[in-house]
C-alpha cells in the first residue's frame, strides 16, 4: 500500500478506522525528510496491512501543533486509536 496524504478532515477517521497507523510528519524544505521519504515509502509497500500516512507540517499546522512536532521528520504510531509511539526519525551523522 502506498502512503496516504493525511489532512485534518480525515485524520480522526483514519486513526479510528484502522488497527495500526504510522504517520510521518515532514516538510518540502526539510533535507532529512527528503532522505527519509523514499525509505518510508518502501516500508509502506512491504506492510500492506498497515496504514502509512504522511502529514505535511506546512500545510497541516494544526495537526503538527496537536502533537507538539518540533523536529522533522517525526514518526508517530497509533494502534487501535491510541498513540503508541512517537519519535523524531533517525538523521545522518
Describe these PLM feature segments:
Residues 1-16:
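N-terminal "domain-start" segment that seeds a small globular fold
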Residues 73-84:
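A short, hydrophobic beta-strand/beta-hairpin element that forms part of a small beta-sheet core
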Residues 17-26:
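Short active-site neighborhood of thiol/selenol oxidoreductases, capturing the structured segment around
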Residues 2, 26, 51-53:
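Conserved Rossmann-like nucleotide-binding pocket used by diverse enzymes
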Residues 20, 37-55:
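Conserved helix-turn-beta segment immediately C-terminal to the redox Cys motif
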Residues 55-63:
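Structural microenvironment flanking redox-active thiols in thiol-disulfide oxidoreductases
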Residues 25-38:
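Conserved redox-active cysteine motifs that mediate thiol-disulfide chemistry
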Residues 85-93:
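Single conserved hydrophobic/aromatic residue that forms the stacking wall/gate
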